[in-house]
Every structure is written in structure tokens, then in C-alpha cells.
UniProtKB/Swiss-Prot annotation:
GO terms for biological process: regulation of DNA-templated transcription. Belongs to the SSX family. Keywords: Phosphoprotein, Transcription, Transcription regulation. Pfam families: SSXRD. Residues 156-170 have a biased composition (Basic residues). SUPFAM superfamilies: KRAB domain (Kruppel-associated box). Residues 145-155 have a biased composition (Polar residues). The modification Phosphoserine is found at S123. The lineage of its organism: Eukaryota, Metazoa, Chordata, Craniata, Vertebrata. One of its GO terms (cellular component) is nucleus. It comes from Homo sapiens. This is Protein SSX7. Residues 179-188 have a biased composition (Acidic residues). InterPro entries: aKRAB, KRAB, KRAB_dom_sf, SSXRD_motif. Could act as a modulator of transcription.
Amino acid sequence: MNGDDAFARRPRAGAQIPEKIQKSFDDIAKYFSKKEWEKMKSLEKISYVYMKRKYEAMTKLGFKATLPPFMHNTGATDLQGNDFDNDRNQGNQVERPQMTFCRLQRIFPKIMPKKPAEEGNDSKGVPEASGSQNDGKHLCPPGKPSTSEKINKTSGPKRGKHAWTHRLRERKQLVIYEEISDPEEDDE
């Protein structure tokens, strides 16, 4: 038996259960009747403890996690004290802290944009082709730049559809690529 699974080991008769384990078991025991709790093996109890911990972690991160099935049994309340079965009772509810944009940006820095897009500048500057109407061609009036010129000139969230183009850099020197042949093809 590994030393890491101390949580999973059964205490000997007369031995005391550590406070941390006892507290987590007590948190889970309130969802079961005394008979059910006594019939459960310690491994089952531990799995319920882990289920609850995962649920707590997901809700703390701001995700809408489904309530574990064993927590439905007694008209359970969620971690913030909100009563699932009785939404009429607004006085007893604790306001849940909302996930702010800055927190999300710290958690998912590459996914979230650095600045929220301005409402007036979404993608109005770049027209899109719609089916066979324009056949993929855009007609620009003579003094206005084409869409490809607009993409090169604009920066930030104003780009709309081509938001990734700012990551590409222009090469200062012309690069010539050679085709490398496979040694297997040379044999034939």
C-alpha cells in the first residue's frame, strides 16, 4: 500500500480519524440517512467527498456545474446558501460573487481579447460576401480602399473577420524556398 492513499485507508478499531477527513465525511454525511451512511464502505464515502470537491471547484471558477446526484436527495442547498427547491425565499440567499472580466482574462489569457470590442466598430468596415449575390467579389467605389487594403491599415478589434492578421509580420528580405525531394522518389 502506498503512503499517498492515507485518505483511503480504513482506521483501525479504536483509532481516531484525522480531523480533515472527519470534517469532509461530516459534510457528505448530511446528504444520506444514518442507515445508508453506515452501510457505505469508506471507498464510496471518499468518492462522494471527491465529487463534492470537484463541484465546489467548478462553481468557484464560475462554471455552471451540474449538482452531483447525491446532493439532490435532501433538497440540498448549494455552496453559497441558495436554496434550489425554494426560489421564493429571497431573504435567505447569499449573493454569489460574479466572475469579472479581469479574472477571466487571467485564467484564459490567450482566449479572451485584451480589450472588449467597441460596439460601433464590430465588423461594419469589412463587408462580407453572401452566397451567389456577389460571387465572392466586392465592388469598391473609386476613391475608397479595397477590403484587403483596409485589413492592412486597420489595427486592433476593428478588423472583424481577419483578427489574426496582426500577428503576421512582413518579411524584410525576399525568401526563396526550394523543393526538397524525398530519397525514396529519387530511387524510382
